[in-house]
UniProtKB/Swiss-Prot annotation:
The gene is uprt. This is Uracil phosphoribosyltransferase. Its EC number is 2.4.2.9. It comes from the Eukaryota. Coiled coil: none annotated. Pathway: Pyrimidine metabolism; UMP biosynthesis via salvage pathway; UMP from uracil: step 1/1.
Amino acid sequence: MAQVPASGKLLVDPRYSTNDQEESILQDIITRFPNVVLMKQTAQLRAMMTIIRDKETPKEEFVFYADRLIRLLIEEALNELPFEKKEVTTPLDVSYHGVSFYSKICGVSIVRAGESMESGLRAVCRGCRIGKILIQRDETTAEPKLIYEKLPADIRDRWVMLLDPMCATAGSVCKAIEVLLRLGVKEERIIFVNILAAPQGIERVFKEYPKVRMVTAAVDICLNSRYYIVPGIGDFGDRYFGTM
């Protein structure tokens, strides 16, 4: 059995894979890219992934379970932030030695699909500032092109949760990271949070930006000829916002 940190037995849907195939992919990713944090593969997580992968799932149900999953992802990503020791006094006048967040954080969503993750971040980080980056493919060069950015003025002093539910070719996320670095954000302070990734996308992210951290719920097998993740979810933004 592949030993994946912080995970239990890897449950595999036999419709698209075998245990050995999926575990081999996950083991390879974890071994080669130590900055990838894979969520613990519990039955609850796999059940939610099954619902949002199902093409027959109606929009309302898709959004409900996607939101649940996103919140769990954000909670997992918060573990990657630095903490400092803090002592408080309980209502029983007894000291408790705990911790508190050490640094300011903000979210940055890659428009449009990344906006689906904003409410999950706000739900667990009250008052968290959120910026946006819009990236589209240049029809002439086929390369990602920055169209729009609206980010906190002090973003260089913050840890950044970069939000995009899918990591296929990683063109958009790499462009977004480029923008953040240009604005003074430290590479090691960027945490890329996504639901589903392809091995090709992960490899590109860490080839270009090895100090970034990535938190994901699942890693799939590959990309198809249209650069969709397989077995995948489909177009997450279209399904979430009902624009299919």
